[in-house]
């Protein structure tokens, strides 16, 4: 009997109750959690409505692919806010007494799986969007003829399934997700790293996240350079790149938001995976980095809400009036058909165009 009682005391929740040095103000945290969850859900709902309307409106194959991937990213952010936010509010409302409402560690495991999935999936989708746009700009004929909506849906499903697999890895390896030191969220084991497997999960998550950011940076750089080269090579075919310009601006904004919000958390997890977690300072740094990462799911939808063609046109007009400088003609924002885009692509990629440009 005494052995059974001692085993019951060493539950995942109880083990952390004796070492809770990283605390948060409960009332304030409940208030901010509710506000964050509400703002995130409303923002993502508005972005989903805008993207779905745009997907129905535009029948350009290149733009439809981008909008489909963007919709997947925003929907992932929406459910991440809904599920993770609801669990976080419940935890705060229960005074963070995990041992009282989650003795079997089921809720913590669900929380941890959702945290990993909703963190990794948008990063991977952002890199896939950057690759798709890079192919669409550098190889537009191949993109228009070979990459169909069916292929894009398969890529979207593949990314989601891969993120689910990574999130389920600890469960498949008979490892539990752990309550973190602040007792407000669950993730991989960061407190008492025992062996290589604990380090592996942390390093794998960090590596995949940083790799996704690196791929996005590289592909967006190639896309931007290609658009600039085409611009200087053939001034008369500007209108064929208007939809490219809008999507590239959105991609750059998504990449900047992801880098700023996710880099601290990914680097912190990598550091814990390599060096371990031995200080209160590491706990506070992790909590700050987590809050930064949470902002990513709030800011992502506003990229599609604010950086639409109509809004960009108005911003351009306002900037032109204030500065008195016309960098580009306003007709670059006018809608162009896929026929014009393919025409520009054919001209810019043909040997004749190269020859005429050189002369």
Curated annotation (Swiss-Prot):
Glycans are attached at residues 4, 19. Gene3D superfamilies: Rhodopsin 7-helix transmembrane proteins (1.20.1070.10). Residues 55-69, 132-152, 225-250, 308-359 are cytoplasmic. The chain crosses the membrane at residues 32-54, 70-90, 110-131, 153-175, 199-224, 251-267, 286-307. One of its GO terms (biological process) is G protein-coupled receptor signaling pathway. CDD domains: 7tmA_FP. Eye. Isoform 1 can form heterodimers with isoform 5 (and probably other isoforms). Receptor for prostaglandin F2-alpha (PGF2-alpha). The activity of this receptor is mediated by G proteins which activate a phosphatidylinositol-calcium second messenger system. Initiates luteolysis in the corpus luteum. Isoforms 2 to 7 do not bind PGF2-alpha but are proposed to modulate signaling by participating in variant receptor complexes; heterodimers between isoform 1 and isoform 5 are proposed to be a receptor for prostamides including the synthetic analog bimatoprost. This is Prostaglandin F2-alpha receptor. It comes from Homo sapiens.
